[in-house]
Amino acid sequence: MFAVSIVPRTTSCRLSSAFLCQLSIPLTLRLHHHYQHHQPHLPSPLSFQIHSLRKQIDMAAQGGDSYEEALAALSSLITKRSRADKSNKGDRFELVFDYLKLLDLEEDILKMNVIHVAGTKGKGSTCTFTESIIRNYGFRTGLFTSPHLIDVRERFRLDGVDISEEKFLGYFWWCYNRLKERTNEEIPMPTYFRFLALLAFKIFAAEEVDAAILEVGLGGKFDATNAVQKPVVCGISSLGYDHMEILGDTLGKIAGEKAGIFKLGVPAFTVPQPDEAMRVLEEKASETEVNLEVVQPLTARLLSGQKLGLDGEHQYVNAGLAVSLASIWLQQIGKLEVPSRTQMSILPEKFIKGLATASLQGRAQVVPDQYTESRTSGDLVFYLDGAHSPESMEACAKWFSVAVKGDNQSGSSGHLVNGSAGSSHDKWSNETCEQILLFNCMSVRDPNLLLPHLKNMCAKYGVNFKKALFVPNMSVYHKVGTAADLPENDPQVDLSWQFTLQKVWESLVQSERDGEKDGESDGNSEVFTSLPMAIKCLRDTVHESSSATRFQVLVTGSLHLVGDVLRLIRK
């Protein structure tokens, strides 16, 4: 299932004449500009440049429908079946290679210099760090991640920036129309994520990126991104229990699925893993003649006083993996000399800059609420993290606890995390701050695992929630739409899952009270019929507060929920 929500559009967008003109600039002029401004860019043969240019012009000519029409077409590819339901023949993995052939991408994908990353948690952050490092060396990068939080174009970054709406439309309709014309009963239209992966391949091929960094969507072995047969290097981020209905109910089985991205003789890196998972990774590496190296977390010393662009102690694990992945790519493809970490007292300057400037929404992100900031003496700050597994929930709780304590002592509402500005209020003491939980998770998750990990880790750091709010997501899983498509309040919404979450939370609170533990106990909880109502309640609480109180709201349990909150508070 996919939560899919897009920033609102007020007008239909078509390919502009400027974009079409760019495609029709004389080839010699474009090539001169290309080499002048991208010196490290790896040149392709002239014939390939001409071929690529013609394909782009053809692509643009076939486009032209509005953004909303593209989203509607994309929505038609979303299946309402469970991910674990393999009854549909359209789910067969080998179909991915048929689609590549239909889109004439077979040769293009062989030429791509791919970094392929799987894992349970941290793979998106690892890919983001890796892309930022390589881009800081002057190479042209393409980054494919999932899910998106606000706009589907977030999944496709070119040189660190979301693909433009114009280019997205051109590439989208080129792929969609061609597949519509060429698919049949035996080779049906690809499902939602597979289409997006194919679209990424098309975008990166046409844009001639030097490095394509691909995050696995689910698992590894049968993921659409695994159509890449000869990546430059592979990475496995931290493993844990997630998607067990698909990947298996043991860490060994899950590790086996993730290791499905290993390719014969292609170097691979992973981070320290539980023993069961590591044994399987090593077995799979041996079977595929892969040199698998375990990378230790990055240390602050190597960063020469700089902070990582993504906050949280767990990001040092992801950054360590990213450094190894980027190093191999720069050595093999960039033909640069990069010393090994054991030889470094500090990282090279461009590595440090890449790690420090990396950004990814919805991961350890701090966003002060601008609406309340200018209207009240109080303060409302959102701490957003899309954690949705027991292990990532603990990491999220640790980050939140450390962040709120540091923010309350320093008087800021968060360091500049992922581009969020701090508050202008003066110093806050712990006595004038209240922590609130805003939570939802998908019904395939087990709240009896997630909520105790979250609550206990926060309590360990002396952070107790004054209140817990449970809400349904605004996003719908069967449609890619705009904000205008989403009702702010649906009286018919089924809240049975939210009441289940509340019951689990209340039982945790009650057991704590019965145990008469020291410290302040967590307070009451409430279920809201919609997320906008919950946000309004939070803002009203700040407005009605008789004292200057900072309300620190942890939003977690689902990246879809995080995306919905970001969209609402930035309206």
Swiss-Prot record:
**What are the required cofactors?**
a monovalent cation
Pathway, per UniProt?
Answer: Cofactor biosynthesis; tetrahydrofolylpolyglutamate biosynthesis
Q: Which residues hold Mg(2+) 1?
A: S146, E215
List S-S links within the chain: none
Q: Which PROSITE patterns does the UniProt entry name for this protein? A: FOLYLPOLYGLU_SYNT_1
Q: Which GO terms describe its biological process?
A: lignin biosynthetic process; one-carbon metabolic process; quiescent center organization; root development; root hair elongation; root meristem growth; tetrahydrofolylpolyglutamate biosynthetic process
Instruction: Identify the EC number(s).
Output: 6.3.2.17
**What keyword terms does UniProt attach to this protein?**
ATP-binding, Chloroplast, Ligase, Magnesium, Metal-binding, Nucleotide-binding, One-carbon metabolism, Plastid
Does Plastid count among this protein's keywords? yes
Q: InterPro entries annotated for this entry?
A: Folylpolyglutamate_synth (IPR001645), Folylpolyglutamate_synth_CS (IPR018109), Folylpolyglutamate_synth_euk (IPR023600), Mur-like_cat_sf (IPR036565), Mur_ligase_C_dom_sf (IPR036615)
Its job: Catalyzes conversion of folates to polyglutamate derivatives allowing concentration of folate compounds in the cell and the intracellular retention of these cofactors, which are important substrates for most of the folate-dependent enzymes that are involved in one-carbon transfer reactions involved in purine, pyrimidine and amino acid synthesis. Essential for organellar and whole-plant folate homeostasis. Required for postembryonic root development.
Q: What is this protein's record name?
A: Folylpolyglutamate synthase
**Source species of the chain:** Arabidopsis thaliana (Mouse-ear cress)
